[in-house]
Amino acid sequence: MANVTLKPLCPLLEEMVQLPNHSNSSLRYIDHVSVLLHGLASLLGLVENGLILFVVGCRMRQTVVTTWVLHLALSDLLAAASLPFFTYFLAVGHSWELGTTFCKLHSSVFFLNMFASGFLLSAISLDRCLQVVRPVWAQNHRTVAVAHRVCLMLWALAVLNTIPYFVFRDTIPRLDGRIMCYYNLLLWNPGPDRDTTCDYRQKALAVSKFLLAFMVPLAIIASSHVAVSLRLHHRGRQRTGRFVRLVAAIVVAFVLCWGPYHIFSLLEARAHSVTTLRQLASRGLPFVTSLAFFNSVVNPLLYVFTCPDMLYKLRRSLRAVLESVLVEDSDQSGGLRNRRRRASSTATPASTLLLADRIPQLRPTRLIGWMRRGSAEVPQRV
């Protein structure tokens, strides 16, 4: 059968176009399970992140910490909102039926979430580092308004990095009639040597997103953690706050969900020159892409499960759960001081009783006699 498209395609994309639709019953069963899992994940992600946004944004006192979480939840909500369309793509037999424009928008949301998540986690780690290493500076400059401005700058940077993926995203017909939504690196200005153009652009995209959205954020997070640990060790403090544990859990989930995707993206870039990697890259990318999508579903669960006595507090309200986790370090220190004051105040009656026990006990008859005699001598205890 002749090629149904006149668009110039890179070698890897040409092989993907020629892949036939599988008719194996076991593979179709896997497709059905995949559609079910993605459908449940999309519903769960929308509900979870919507609740987090509502509670943190409308029902909690606004702090720098809640500002970070608010923007992180917004990024996850955007990714979760795109999951139903990806589920529809799977349900109709891995064919994109929603047009080229929506293909570009849908894919851009995925990459926007990828960059925004990495940038926001970096900002959270740096904020924690400044609190510990430069407490006076943080006290004077660390405000909710500044945090919002930083988040807006990070969103702008994420949008800027997403533009190439929007530009090169395209719909490509397959030989079996299905439609792919993938990036066509020869869509704009292919140049005289198409193989060189494909190889250069594919490696540039894979390496740039691997560095900017994964390795650089992890380096910032790791260096910030080391700086904080050294400073706390110098002060003789090793106590870890709840929000620090929450950030650690989110970072672990970020690495587990996005790490495989970046590895396969690098394999895909390498597959342009190493043909033996092409089948592995084309088969593995859909699975690791789904895993990356699920990161937006996992994060809201971490907000709740890092809270102690989670089930008890869930009976009270989601707000109580989040307020116990998204607490500023200064608030925790203040709470600790208040608890110490209450403990000292409860110890006062005991000390008073001890002092009273040491004061000589006066019998009424002896006290009356002493007052009649007008003696200046204090009666002795008997």
Swiss-Prot record:
GO cellular component, one term: plasma membrane
Keywords: Cell membrane, Disulfide bond, G-protein coupled receptor, Glycoprotein, Membrane, Phosphoprotein, Receptor, Transducer, Transmembrane, Transmembrane helix
Disulfide bonds: C103-C181
SUPFAM superfamilies linked to this entry: Family A G protein-coupled receptor-like (SSF81321)
PTM annotation (Phosphoserine): residues: S330, S344
Residues with attached carbohydrate: N3, N21, N24
Membrane topology, Extracellular segments: 1-32, 89-105, 168-209, 269-287
Gene disruption: observed consequences: Deficient mice are fertile and grew normally. Ear-swelling responses induced by hapten-specific IgE are less pronounced in deficient mice, giving 35-55% of the responses of normal mice. The reduction in cutaneous responses is associated with decreased infiltration of lymphocytes, eosinophils, and basophils and decreased production of macrophage-derived chemokine and RANTES at inflammatory sites.
GO biological process: adenylate cyclase-inhibiting G protein-coupled receptor signaling pathway; calcium-mediated signaling; chemotaxis; G protein-coupled receptor signaling pathway; negative regulation of male germ cell proliferation; positive regulation of G protein-coupled receptor signaling pathway
Membrane-spanning residues: 33-55, 67-88, 106-126, 146-167, 210-230, 247-268, 288-307
Coiled-coil segments on the chain, per record: none
Membrane topology: Multi-pass membrane protein
Post-translational modification: Phosphorylated.
UniProt motif (Involved in the recycling of CRTH2) ranges: 329-332
GO molecular function: G protein-coupled receptor activity; prostaglandin D receptor activity; prostaglandin F receptor activity; prostaglandin J receptor activity
InterPro entries from the UniProt entry: Formyl_rcpt-rel, GPCR_Rhodpsn, GPCR_Rhodpsn_7TM
Location in or out of the cell: Cell membrane
Domain notes: The 329-DSEL-332 motif is involved in the recycling of PTGDR2 to the cell surface after agonist-induced internalization. This motif seems to be required for GRK2 and GPRK5/GRK5 to promote agonist-induced internalization. Thr-346 is a major site for PKC-induced internalization of the receptor.
Family from the record: Belongs to the G-protein coupled receptor 1 family.
Function: Receptor for prostaglandin D2 (PGD2). Coupled to the G(i)-protein. Receptor activation may result in pertussis toxin-sensitive decreases in cAMP levels and Ca(2+) mobilization. PI3K signaling is also implicated in mediating PTGDR2 effects. PGD2 induced receptor internalization. CRTH2 internalization can be regulated by diverse kinases such as, PKC, PKA, GRK2, GPRK5/GRK5 and GRK6. Receptor activation is responsible, at least in part, in immune regulation and allergic/inflammation responses.
Matching PANTHER family: CHEMOTACTIC RECEPTOR (PTHR24225), G-PROTEIN COUPLED RECEPTORS FAMILY 1 PROFILE DOMAIN-CONTAINING PROTEIN-RELATED (PTHR24225:SF72)
Record-given protein name: Prostaglandin D2 receptor 2
Taxonomic path: Eukaryota, Metazoa, Chordata, Craniata, Vertebrata
